[in-house]
Amino acid sequence: MADVLSVLRQYNTQKKEIVVKGDEVIFGEFSWPKNVKTNYVIWGTGKEGQPREYYTLDSILFLLNNVHLSHPVYVRRAATENIPVVRRPDRKDLLAYLNGETSTSSSIDRSAPLEIGLQRSTQVKRAADEILAEAKKPRIEDEECVRLDKERLAARLEGHKEGIVQTEQIRSLSEAMSVEKIAAIKAKIMAKKRSTIKTDLDDDITALKQRSFVDAEVDVTRDIVSRERVWRTRTTILQSTGKNFAKNIFAILQSVKAREEGRAPEQRPAPNTAPTDPTLRNKQPIPAAYNRYDQERFKGKEETEGFKIDTMGTYHGMTLKSVTEGASARKTQTPAAQPVPRPVSQARPPPNQKKGSRTPIIIIPAATTSLITMLNAKDLLQDLKFVPSDEKKKQGCQRENETLIQRRKDQMQPGGTTVSVTVPYRVVDQPLKLMPQDWDRVVAVFVQGPAWQFKGWPWLLPDGSPVDIFAKIKAFHLKYDEVRLDPNVQKWDVTVLELSYHKRHLDRPVFLRFWETLDRYMVKHKSHLRF
């Protein structure tokens, strides 16, 4: 049986009449409730783990009846009549499918459970006015109709009885035919009579009982239909309802995997206390009688005790190395040494606990218009020279999600000598991917200008101002010296770094000033990090 959305499309394209009576929508000999769900997915549902929701028949039928209205007027009228509206992104695609312009739609979920419509019997179902009219008739007419039906059925049964084979006819035929032939003919005639009488009886009894049992049959049918499920095969499951095949199939695989894991629990040893019969529980334990062969169980063990021979041992499943080493290798395995308690001054965390990272993090803008990007961040901050991002693209450089730069600096030793050391810094342009514990290691951020750069950041004020962010993270702004300063950067606590368009020999002092400013900030606020 077709789904309600396909039936509605067929009636709409063929301009057939759709009857709405009470809480039911009637399509010829089938009917569905108004609030029955179709298999057309509502836009915006079924994403990011949310369950899918479907339009009801009433909402789609209301859209067809008011398709001439503009969408705002249609929404107001639907809200007045308390009917769910069809959302604007679904309106054009849904109307194109219902009007026959397209054969299918990507929003139709073929795997959704179908609501089976109730079949309306034209002979049994009667209109409400006819039922009221018959209720006003005298009771005698109904009794008279039933009596006439019974007399007609009895007359038909009597007619069949007259046609039954008579015994004297069998006696007359016995002279001309054998007993086997007569029995075969009699069996054929009786079989034919039984089938004929059975068919007539079914028709008459059905005609008599349809009036009184029709409501009970409808209730039973509705209960059966409500328990039905859509028959799924390998072919129907592998048919994706959308453009993304993995979204449908991988979800099914995950459900199958979860179900299989749930069916195979850990195998635990059976408890010793097994349920026993109460009659056996009450019986007293019978003392074991003497057995002359019990002594044989300990005889072999006593004879080989001095040779240390395991008479029940085996080499099955053992490797050559384990056989040659013998028991000596097993004796060398000593039990694990007990941990020696240490004084509090020498206490240290267990080796399996992961220590927090001390590598500082620098955040740069993700916009391609920024002077510093993931393509040239290593050239600017590590090599202290400016290389435009476009030039790096021409060289075939690939953009990475994050990069690790090695800053070379001179560190003063206690003896007064300086040693060149290398300190790592982590550079990222996707701050929303940072873990909550990583934000404590963020030491610098390059500001582009617009405030939307800090959307989703911690410490952001309700009005979207990043003032509190700059109080916890050192902010820098990189621009050309001939470009006008952004108004937002002017009013924020940001250190401006200016580069020349053509004088590349001036790049090194600019980036050295960046590192000096950052070092002073980290000494004061981030001294627990490595720098």
Swiss-Prot record:
Q: Where is the composition biased (Basic and acidic residues)?
A: 293-303
The question of whether Lipid metabolism is a record keyword is answered with no
What's the protein called, per UniProt?
Parafibromin
Query: What's in the keyword line of the UniProt record?
Result: Cell cycle, Nucleus, Transcription, Tumor suppressor
Q: Where in the cell is it found?
A: Nucleus
> Which Gene3D superfamilies does the record match to this protein?
RNA polymerase II accessory factor, Cdc73 C-terminal domain
Subunit field text? Component of the PAF1 complex, which at least consists of CDC73, PAF1, LEO1, CTR9 and RTF1.
For biological process, the GO terms are: endodermal cell fate commitment; mRNA 3'-end processing; negative regulation of cell population proliferation; negative regulation of G1/S transition of mitotic cell cycle; negative regulation of myeloid cell differentiation; negative regulation of transcription by RNA polymerase II; positive regulation of cell cycle G1/S phase transition; positive regulation of mRNA 3'-end processing
Give the compositionally biased regions (Pro residues): 338-352
Q: Which organism is it from?
A: Gallus gallus (Chicken)
What this chain does, per the entry, is described as: Tumor suppressor probably involved in transcriptional and post-transcriptional control pathways. May be involved in cell cycle progression through the regulation of cyclin D1/PRAD1 expression. Component of the PAF1 complex (PAF1C) which has multiple functions during transcription by RNA polymerase II. PAF1C associates with RNA polymerase II, is involved in transcriptional elongation and in histone modifications including methylation on histone H3 'Lys-4' (H3K4me3).
